Regions:
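Beta-strand secondary-structure signal
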Residues: 60, 101, 138-140
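Conserved glycine-rich acetyl-CoA-binding loop
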Residues: 50, 69-86, 93-95, 99, ...
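Acetyl-CoA-dependent GNAT
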Residues: 2-74, 85-87, 91, 95, ...
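Positions that flank functional sites
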Residues: 33, 107, 130
Length: 144
């Protein structure tokens, strides 16, 4: 398995993985538009050209938001998410980013534990943020 920068041939499998996770929160067109932005970066985990997962970042000069980090639901627990997050941390250090921020549903306990494992801490909450009424927890990791 390797982590590489997004290329356009990856968009269909990336969207397929995203669609299973987000209950329609992203449309194909929104994903395509985001990927065309200069400040959006996407890393893809692949095995023999099969997309296993991805991470989508939106950066500013000093920090970035992790918009999505998603692994194919049939392949979770195999270290793919860990490899993607390590790439995020490496990118942050290489580009001298001060911090990374993300949102996670308050009932997504596995994701919360995953983020905490990488040193993210909860800094806030957005009540009733998701369509289903769930709260979003805001997490942040400082690099500098």
């Amino acid at each position: 398995m390797k982590i590489s920068e997004f290329c356009w041939e990856d968009i269909a499998p990336v969207f397929a993985i995203l669609a299973t996770e987000n209950n329609g929160a992203w449309t194909y067109e929104q994903l395509e538009h985001s990927l065309k932005l200069e400040n959006v970066i996407c890393y893809v985990a692949k095995n023999d050209d099969k997309v296993l997962g991805f991470v989508l970042l939106e950066e500013t000069p000093y920090d970035f938001d992790i918009l999505e980090i998603v692994v194919d639901e049939n392949l979770r627990g195999r270290g793919i998410g860990t490899m993607l997050m390590k790439r995020v941390v490496d990118y942050a250090k290489l580009t001298h980013k001060e911090k990374a921020t993300l949102e996670v549903a308050s009932d997504n306990k596995n994701a919360i534990m995953f983020y905490e494992k990488f040193g993210f801490s909860q800094i806030g909450m957005r009540k009733n943020y998701y369509k289903n009424g769930n709260d979003a927890l805001v997490f942040q990791k400082t690099f500098i």
